[in-house]
């Protein structure tokens, strides 16, 4: 459960406790889509770079190796040898973004696998069963991820259906948690706010899902085409209606600047594939801004990726060496780059928490919000 420790404006410093530990918030969840970080990082690596929460994907694990296999192996924690908290998303985003020939019905969604084209059905109960088999600490509600922009009439109908699906998710999560052989009987369900960029629809939906008294709530359907300012406006509109005693999660966001600005608006949890994805293409974060290590100017650069960084990579390797690895297409390049970028994100959250602890978050925001958005 969530405990608010301190606040500065709307920014919140807190703790979230679940079956596998206590999380210091604000926090960035490191994304291991298929039970692993893309870039060859292990669960041990995650511990060494300060990861608190690992996020895995319901849709992908349902397809491979299947959630039933993971259950037979004792759950996702045991399967991937990660003993910290795990959040699994519902699979909804992937159903709507990856799958072809999808058909949305009241009971759920019929779609074709992006791997082999086989027909699959997923509804609220199926998503809850899959996530129960995985045994995550936090399971996300099954929702429809709406494209931006979408017609207002369709958005209204969609969020009404997403609300009805959430009611079904809550009932099924409670039923599964009560079973004697469930993997994690303390699994918590978080609801997801939708509504595209229509603030009034977002607010109405947030009010309704808040009445269901869930342990946490997410803002979904952002960072999918709207501007950063539109995203911030939606957060500001919805935040007053998010329960103050529950965790708040902004799904799929974002850049370091996005995170700082969302923390300032009251968000506690974040996730994004971007730091690892950027790293795999030699785009690396530093405390002065982002660099592209494939640039020829780094060919003879003996300095670390970031002289201000104390990650395992920056303590040992030069820009010139890692650039060489990328040019030579060595696998080690991706591993070192991903390790650095995820360490940077975890350290960013630590600095944000420290700033909140000392009452200096606004000063931190002024110093870094714009600086971290630039390319050098």
Q: Predicted regions: what is each one?
A:
Residues 1-183, 296-299:
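Non-catalytic, usually N-terminal nucleic-acid engagement modules in DNA/RNA processing proteins
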Residues 21, 54, 89, 131, ...:
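Conserved, mostly hydrophobic/aromatic
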Residues 21, 162-169, 209, 238, ...:
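Hydrophobic alpha-helical packing residues
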Residues 148-152, 156, 216-222, 331-334:
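Glycine- and acidic
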């Amino acid at each position: 459960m969530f405990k608010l420790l301190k606040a500065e404006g709307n920014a919140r410093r807190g703790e979230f406790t679940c079956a596998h530990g206590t999380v210091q918030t604000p926090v960035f969840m490191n994304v291991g889509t298929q039970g692993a970080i893309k870039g060859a990082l292990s669960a041990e690596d995650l511990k060494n770079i300060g990861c608190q929460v690992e996020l895995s994907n319901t849709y992908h694990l349902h397809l491979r190796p299947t959630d039933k296999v993971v259950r037979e192996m004792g759950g996702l924690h045991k399967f991937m040898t990660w003993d910290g908290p795990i959040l699994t998303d519902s699979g909804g985003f992937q159903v709507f973004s990856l799958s072809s020939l999808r058909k949305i019905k009241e009971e759920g969604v019929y779609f074709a696998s992006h791997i082999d084209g086989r027909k699959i059905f997923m509804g609220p109960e199926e998503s809850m069963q899959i996530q129960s088999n995985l045994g995550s600490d936090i399971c996300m509600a099954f929702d429809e991820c709406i494209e931006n922009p979408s017609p207002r009439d369709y958005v209204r109908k969609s969020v009404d259906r997403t609300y009805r699906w959430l009611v079904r998710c809550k009932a099924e999560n409670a039923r599964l948690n009560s079973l004697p052989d469930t993997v994690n009987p303390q699994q918590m369900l978080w609801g997801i706010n939708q509504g595209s960029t229509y603030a009034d629809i977002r607010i109405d939906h947030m009010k309704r899902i808040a009445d269901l008294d869930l342990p946490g709530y997410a803002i979904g359907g952002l960072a999918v085409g709207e501007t950063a300012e539109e995203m911030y406006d939606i957060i500001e509109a919805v935040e007053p209606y998010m329960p103050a005693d529950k965790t708040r999660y902004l799904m799929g966001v974002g850049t370091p600047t996005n995170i700082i600005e969302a923390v300032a608006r009251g968000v506690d949890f974040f996730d994004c594939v971007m730091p690892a994805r950027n790293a795999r293409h030699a785009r690396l974060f530093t405390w002065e801004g982002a660099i592209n290590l494939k640039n020829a100017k780094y060919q003879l650069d003996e300095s670390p990726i970031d002289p201000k960084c104390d990650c395992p990579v920056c303590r040992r390797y030069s820009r010139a060496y890692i650039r060489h690895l990328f040019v030579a297409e060595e696998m080690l390049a991706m591993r070192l780059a991903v390790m650095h970028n995820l360490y940077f994100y975890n350290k960013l959250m630590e600095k944000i928490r420290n700033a909140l602890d000392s009452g200096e978050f606004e000063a931190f925001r002024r110093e870094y919000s714009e600086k971290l958005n630039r390319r050098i």
